[in-house]
Each structure stands twice: as C-alpha cells, then as structure tokens.
Design a protein with these regions (language model features):
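Short, charge/polar-rich alpha-helical segments
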Residues: 1-13
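Short, charged, amphipathic alpha-helical segments
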Residues: 32-44, 64-65
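Non-transmembrane alpha-helical oligomerization segments
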Residues: 16, 42, 49, 63, ...
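Non-transmembrane amphipathic alpha-helical segments
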Residues: 12-26, 45
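Amphipathic alpha-helical binding modules
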Residues: 66-102
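Amphipathic alpha-helical coiled-coil segments
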Residues: 43-62, 77-82
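Short, Lys/Glu-rich amphipathic helical modules
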Residues: 20-38
C-alpha cells in the first residue's frame, strides 16, 4: 500500500469517527431523520473503508484483523443487540456459521 492510499484510508476512518460522534450527539434527539441520515452515512463510509482495505492490502490476511478492529470499535453496540428476522437471508447465513463453524 502506498502512502497516498494509507492516508486516504486513515482519512476515511477519521470521517467515520466524526459521524459516530454525531450519532452519539443526536441519539437522544427527537429527530429520527438526523439519526437515520448519520447511520446511513456511517454505513456507506464503512463499506467504502472495507472495500479500500481489501483492494489495497496486497492480499495480506492481516487486513482481516484491521477490519475486525474496526467493527469492534464502531459497531460493537449494534452487534451486541443484533436480532435477525426469521425470514432474513442474513439469519440463514448466521445459522450456517453457528451450525457448521462454531
């Protein structure tokens, strides 16, 4: 990974951190619209970050550790309160992991 890509990725992480702080700031607000917009922005930036990490990591498996750190930092609360609908395809994938790889 060259220096430009590194700094670009670090900038994305900083931007996600700023959005996360705005989410905390607006979590008790009466406006679900603001909260929803920040959540969407955080998710878009997160998707972009993961894509950038995967495409610029020179196929190093250590990038998965960095992604894990990112998820634990910025999505830990969401993961701890996660409940899939029974018909959700993600629930089916989760079930396969639990049944076969736990």
């Amino acid at each position: 990974m060259n220096d430009n890509k590194l700094y670009h990725i670090l900038d994305i992480i900083e931007e996600i951190n700023k959005v996360d702080k705005m989410l905390v700031l607006h979590k008790d607000s009466n406006s679900d619209l603001m909260s929803s917009q920040y959540k969407n922005q955080k998710l878009k930036l997160s998707n972009y970050l993961v894509k950038e990490l995967l495409t610029n990591s020179d196929n190093r498996t250590e990038v998965m550790y960095i992604i894990k750190l990112f998820i634990e930092k910025f999505y830990n609360k969401e993961i701890n309160h996660l409940q899939f609908e029974e018909n959700d395809n993600l629930k089916k994938i989760e079930d396969v992991f639990i049944e076969n790889y736990a």
